[in-house]
């Protein structure tokens, strides 16, 4: 796992958008970007990276009964090759699929999506904790 401290350059209103902009600036030198909602099987957040932040969720369209099943389905269809968790203090932890799987199994939970979004089970990351940061920095 690689670690990258990000400069705070974004002025986006949403936290997840700000962190994505800060990561984009660190890897491409470009900070402005129109945020869109692109299907995970058709594109990535930044280059070939999928960005996650505290309390993020994986796509609710994933098939499977367990977190491991849903991750396996995601990896079959995902356009991303690398996964990034950006901490509350703007540190990016860049992971491969194996590391990301271990991270999600340790710090993810299954929860039901809202009825307006179909009510399917989805994987949500827990809020950032000292235990999570210790795991990321080990």
Predicted regions and their residues:
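Short beta-strand segments enriched in small/hydrophobic residues
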Residues: 2-10
């Amino acid at each position: 796992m690689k670690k990258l401290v990000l400069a705070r350059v974004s002025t986006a209103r949403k936290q997840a958008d700000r962190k994505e902009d800060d990561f984009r600036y660190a890897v491409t030198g470009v900070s402005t970007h129109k945020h869109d909602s692109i299907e995970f099987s058709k594109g990535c957040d930044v280059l070939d990276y999928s960005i996650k932040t505290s309390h993020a969720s994986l796509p609710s369209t994933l098939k499977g009964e367990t977190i491991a099943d849903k991750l396996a389905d995601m990896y079959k269809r995902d356009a991303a090759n690398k996964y990034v968790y950006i901490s509350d203090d703007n540190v990016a932890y860049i992971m491969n699929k194996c590391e990301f799987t271990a991270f999600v199994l340790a710090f993810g939970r299954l929860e039901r999506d809202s009825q307006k979004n179909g009510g399917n089970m989805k994987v949500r990351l827990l809020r950032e904790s000292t235990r999570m940061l210790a795991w990321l920095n080990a």
